[in-house]
From Swiss-Prot:
Record's function text: Sequence-specific endonuclease that cleaves unmethylated GATC sequences. It is involved in DNA mismatch repair.
Superkingdom as given in the UniProt entry: Bacteria
Entry keyword set: Cytoplasm, DNA damage, DNA repair, Endonuclease, Hydrolase, Nuclease
Residue runs in coiled coils: none
Name of the gene encoding the protein in the UniProt record: mutH
Protein name: DNA mismatch repair protein MutH
Biological process terms in GO annotation: DNA modification; mismatch repair
Family, similarity comment: Belongs to the MutH family.
Length: 221
């Protein structure tokens, strides 16, 4: 892995230098093997980019470049530049959430400054041939932060009330809560409506595609 960048500009320059390169070229330099597809290797693209950019946090709650206060997010896009899938932000806390505020939340920390790296995501393009796009450094506008905060507070209120099982992907305008587990056996603790502990699937916060589409549109229009 390349050493961690020491400044925001160094990170941005690195990201600009890999723009236009294919996954095959980037994997070759990193000594990584390109999988046939991403069905069993969902995190492969992120790991490839982390290697080239010197990210250190992995999937821990901290930002990928904690010393710079920057989170790295790859975003698969279509031929027309639209996001093809929702963007995972972080795992949602299901216990010990009484009194937790938006300002203290992992979601706000992760999204305070994001280095977005668009990547070709159309399924018919072989993975090795897909290319990395031009990066953008983004922080939420006051309006975007207000949207995120409102959704986060609505979802967290349902968790606090023991209604986690009633939350669907339809909740939230820009931020949604969905099960996040490699299989249905990976259960975690939460609270039921009667306040007693229950076992449920881990949940993750995800950004809706219309939200990330607006970010991309504003920067690349």
């Amino acid at each position: 892995m390349k050493p961690a960048p020491t400044t925001q500009q160094e990170l941005l320059t690195r990201a600009q230098q890999i723009a236009g390169l294919s996954f095959a070229e980037l994997a070759d330099e990193a000594g990584m093997t390109v999988p046939p597809d991403l069905r069993k290797d969902k995190g492969w693209v992120g790991q490839l980019l982390e290697w080239h950019l010197g990210a250190t946090a992995g999937s821990r709650p901290q930002q990928d470049f904690e010393h710079l206060g920057i989170e790295l997010k790859s975003i698969p896009i279509s031929y027309t530049g639209k996001p093809l899938e929702t963007t995972f932000v972080c795992v949602a806390p299901l216990t010990g959430v009484h009194g937790l505020t938006w300002e203290q939340s992992h979601v706000r920390n992760k999204l305070s400054k994001v280095l977005w790296i668009p990547v070709q995501g159309e399924r018919e393009i072989p993975l090795a041939e897909r290319c990395v796009g031009y990066p953008l450094l983004w922080s939420p506008s006051p309006e975007e932060e207000a949207q995120l905060k409102a959704d986060w507070e609505e979802l967290m209120e349902l968790i606090v009330l023991g209604k986690v099982a009633q939350i669907t992907a339809k909740h939230g305008e820009v931020l949604q809560l969905r099960p996040k587990a490699a299989n249905g056996r990976a259960l975690t603790e939460a609270y039921g409506a009667n306040g007693r502990p229950i076992k449920t699937l881990p949940r993750g916060f995800y950004l809706r595609t219309q939200f990330t589409a607006q970010i991309l549109q504003r920067y690349y229009a």
